[in-house]
Regions:
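Short N-terminal segments immediately surrounding and downstream of signal-peptide cleavage
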Residues: 19-40
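Sec-dependent N-terminal signal peptides
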Residues: 3-13
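Compact alpha-helical subdomains of small soluble proteins
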Residues: 90-166
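Sec/Tat signal peptide C-region and signal peptidase I cleavage site
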Residues: 13-19
Length: 166
């Protein structure tokens, strides 16, 4: 029993250290170009438009996660629920745009599933980078976007994009 308890404690500590190292690494390697570069072209270029929906989905999803895990808000907090809804709406929209505008196909279950497989890894990668940046901000001055003008602008643009698309 004692060995099982020691093993459990070591496993939890290693997992936490891995998670912290991963977050630090994500914060260091934040290399996303400003969202404004894509916003300018999004009305006339479908690739720029899908990039906006993927990036916005990722930013809003990672913001919800950061509010919960870094700021300690409960998962049923209205702010988190709103961000999660916008994240999922934009994520689903990315899949549909990918099928209809990028591939030029009529939406059905099969090509929707293929789109999820192609698009979701990008969203996950963006979420990792955004969360890393949010985590770095939180470590530096206990804020998420309050002192980060780029994330403020991108969050504002993403909420506006969601409002226009719904």
């Amino acid at each position: 029993m004692r060995y099982a308890l020691i093993f459990l404690i070591l496993t939890v500590n290693f997992a936490r250290a891995d998670d912290e190292n991963f977050t630090r690494k994500a914060a260091k390697h934040y290399n996303l170009t400003p969202l404004s570069d894509y916003l300018q072209d999004a009305s006339s270029n479908t690739h720029a438009f899908i990039e906006v929906t993927k990036r916005c989905s990722a930013l809003l999803g990672s913001s919800a996660w950061a509010l919960s895990h870094l700021n300690g808000l409960s998962d049923d907090d209205p702010q988190i629920l709103d961000l999660d809804t916008m994240y999922e709406d934009l994520r689903q929209f990315s899949f549909r745009v990918h099928v209809q505008a990028i591939r030029g196909e009529k939406l059905n279950r099969d090509n929707y599933t293929e789109s999820v497989i192609e698009v979701d890894p990008d969203i996950h990668d963006y979420q990792t980078q955004y969360f890393g940046r949010l985590h770095r901000n939180h470590d530096k001055d206990a804020t998420l976007i309050e002192n980060d003008l780029l994330l403020q602008d991108e969050t504002f643009a993403c909420i506006g994009t969601h409002e226009q698309l719904r």
